[in-house]
């Protein structure tokens, strides 16, 4: 995921448990996975319970002081916040902590940039990165200059991202034009598909649930399978022959995740249209994951937000072999169980 010889960033993860959220601990575990996938090593974690996220500094004053001490004690080079930071929060944190400050969105975009292989994928990722960056140049300039590279600085193909506001807006315009052409091409393909009356099933699910594995098993598609987050970004469509000489098309789509960046959803519209236009959704669930019920909820909500809620859906539980050890876990006596 990162260049050989490149020094790993030593980061502290920061999260806020609000009164309305109850998944902060699991979200921070996921953020650790994201950070490692992007090429960082987590050296510490800090969490604060608050009524709401602090509008100016994300964390409250006392927790910020604690974070400063942790940065020094653990020799950390940066902080990753578990929520998308506003431009004000990013700028204030950078000045307060005097280190590189990142957020969940920046890390996810960085991973997407490293994973993008096709020209369409690269256009979509770079557009999302630049839209995110354009609103945060003041804080990011100082923050990124501290290390000069690493998470948040790389575009698709290890291309260094632009920092000049005028050039960023010019590049965004170019990418939007290119994406319009891509979208027209996709619409043409879908139109031809509609005329053929072949039904389409889109494989959806949380990242690393096993969507590509299912596609490969059913169609021998040869799509990359890896036990990591966002192993594949670009949709792959293959024909599947059914009994009775029927045929359908199966499409593997990009995985979802909690707190999916808005800019990413907007930029990947042409790709996510595959979900909206499908006749059937095949929802792959990693049943072995301890948080699988929350992952199902995240996917369902994302699908609804995309305008695909209410479509016929088939749920496929994957990794059932890894789940059997959990089926017979005895509850604790204090939970009211009897022996």
Predicted regions located by residue number:
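Conserved G1/Walker A P-loop phosphate-binding module
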Residues: 181-251
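Conserved catalytic network of the ASCE P-loop NTPase/AAA+ motor domain
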Residues: 5-6, 72-73, 241-243, 249, ...
């Amino acid at each position: 995921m990162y260049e050989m010889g490149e020094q790993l960033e030593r980061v502290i993860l920061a999260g806020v448990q609000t009164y309305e959220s109850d998944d902060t601990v699991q979200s921070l575990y996921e953020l650790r996975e994201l950070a490692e996938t992007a090429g960082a090593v987590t050296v510490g974690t800090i969490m604060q319970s608050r009524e709401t996220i602090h509008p100016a500094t994300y964390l409250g004053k006392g927790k910020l002081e604690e974070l400063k001490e942790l940065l020094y004690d653990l020799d950390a080079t940066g902080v990753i916040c578990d929520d998308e930071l506003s431009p004000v929060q990013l700028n204030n944190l950078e000045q307060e902590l005097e280190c590189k400050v990142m957020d969940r969105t920046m890390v996810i975009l960085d991973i997407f940039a490293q994973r993008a292989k096709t020209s369409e994928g690269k256009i979509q990722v770079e557009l999302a990165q630049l839209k995110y960056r354009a609103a945060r140049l003041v804080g990011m300039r100082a923050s990124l200059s501290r290390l000069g590279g690493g998470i948040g600085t790389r575009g698709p193909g290890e291309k260094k991202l632009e920092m000049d506001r005028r050039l960023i807006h010019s590049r965004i315009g170019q990418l939007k034009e290119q994406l319009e052409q891509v979208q027209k091409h996709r619409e043409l393909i879908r139109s031809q598909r509609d005329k053929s009356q072949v039904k389409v099933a889109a494989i959806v699910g949380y990242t690393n649930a096993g969507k590509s594995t299912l596609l490969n098993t059913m169609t021998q598609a040869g799509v990359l399978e890896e036990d990591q987050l966002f192993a594949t970004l670009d949709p792959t469509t293959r024909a599947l022959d059914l009994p009775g000489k029927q045929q359908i098309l199966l499409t593997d789509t990009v995985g979802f995740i909690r707190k999916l960046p808005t800019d990413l959803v907007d930029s990947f519209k042409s790709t996510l249209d595959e979900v909206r236009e499908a006749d059937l959704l095949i929802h792959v669930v990693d049943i072995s994951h301890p948080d699988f019920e929350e992952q199902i909820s995240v996917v369902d909500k994302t699908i609804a937000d995309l305008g695909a809620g209410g479509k016929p859906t088939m749920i496929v539980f994957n990794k059932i072999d890894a789940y059997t050890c959990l089926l017979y876990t005895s509850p604790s006596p204090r939970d009211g169980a009897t022996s």
